[in-house]
Amino acid sequence: MRFIGLVVIFLAAVTASAGPVTRIEWEENILALHAPEVPGGKVETWYLEAFCRSGSTDRDWEATVIPHTTRLVEADGDGQWVKLESMVQEGVRATHEIRVVEDGVSFALVIKNESGEAVDVDWAQPCMRVGDFTGLGQEDYFSRCFIYTRAGQVMLDRLPRVEEARYRGGQVYVPAGVDLDDVNPRPISKEVPVNNLIGCVSSDGRWILATAWDATQELFQGVINCIHADPRIGGLKAGEAKRITGRVYLVPNDSEGLLAAYERDFGK
């Protein structure tokens, strides 16, 4: 029996580190994905940067952001999962369960309006920092970033860029069906993505880092060496709760393999 117990412990250790992400941790609103094999050794995400109201495209950013706080509820001692809780002003509570999986990290959110009135909480912003991963600076890192269009995987420097907006810099890619009045007040591309994936290629060309949510407000190439797939909430009625799922993929540089993983998780 002692031998069997040792085998179980060994297999658990192997399973925990089977993929490139070996462990995760969350502290002071930063989610760190530790991945020793990839350039930079880890990927950090500002989680969460913001919860946002609708009508955001042509409005001062301060009027769009809904104040919130996030705290660590519980964490696995081996760094395989964390549980968080966000309290959003106006009576909204969000619980987050984030887990290491074989090809990255999974997110399961439940966001509930605990007030007696409808709340205009339209979308949220996790901000993934990719400067170390891509090995490039703010002016050119987007040349290693991509979305999927009708032409397939396309690097962002190959797409026409828009410059004019309430705030200059970056580029917003809006999925079909999302109101163009309700996204980031940065330049909005005329290119419509065909899925909810945005990602980038590592500086050594060996890895893809990508992110997606089942419901997405926007894909955003930002202004601090970051990329966003911003989950859509779509407002909450009094007492209403919604479930949202997301993924970070850290996989070998194979576009078809990434698409297969995305379709496994979210469908075509």
Predicted regions and their residues:
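Beta-strand-rich recognition/accessory modules
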Residues: 75-76, 85-88, 174-268
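Beta-strand secondary-structure signal
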Residues: 32, 83, 95, 106-110, ...
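Acidic (Asp/Glu-rich), glycine- and aromatic
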Residues: 100-148
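Acidic-aromatic substrate-binding/catalytic surfaces of carbohydrate-active enzymes
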Residues: 19-72
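Bacterial N-terminal signal peptides
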Residues: 5-13
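Sec/Tat signal peptide C-region and signal peptidase I cleavage site
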Residues: 14-18
